[in-house]
């Protein structure tokens, strides 16, 4: 008689369920939050984890917008009044404007479109829908709200911090006093670097991680140069965009971990 292992009742179900949970795990979002994240998780008391998430999003927006506003005030009211800073911030844009060509102008348009108000929302929504189909609502929220927090913080800053765009021929007709910060740069970081963070959190292959991050970093760099080439932003505006984008991604990681902790 041949021996045959008989699994206990329910064994296959548990195994498949384990695989399903593993397939949904995003380590960077599923880690236990630090002290600040635990504090956010405890704020709604015994309420539903969704309330933790909603409250966290509000805190994230207020924090990122405040950081952007303070940085913008320092740039426009302090740094630019230091002798030589304003000229140094304008000169790279003038250099790029003097060396424009048909091919470079077309390339700058592509860079702007990649981080524009049409492409990035589509990328974020499609990725979020995929996450929802996989029944990972916190991942979907991260993908959507990283861009939403970035965009709201950027818009708030441009309304309250007024800086004129570079004094060169500008290739786009946008409000002239909304130079700081670069929303395209911030949005490209929020989406492309946010997705890279999620992917490299799951992928164990070191070479693949390096390749993903290389692309995710090069895209915002390309976008930043495109915006300066087109006469829309100064280098300090781009730096402000980097701050907003990185802050938005960091805040959403914290909020997502906090909501996960509340759910557990």
Pin down the residues of each PLM region.
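C-terminal ends of transmembrane alpha-helices
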Residues: 72-74, 155-165, 222-230
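Membrane-interface loops
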Residues: 80, 86-87, 122-125, 130-214
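Membrane-embedded catalytic cores of phosphoryl/pyrophosphoryl-handling enzymes
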Residues: 170-264
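Terminal transmembrane helix and immediately flanking juxtamembrane interfaces
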Residues: 1-139, 235, 239-264
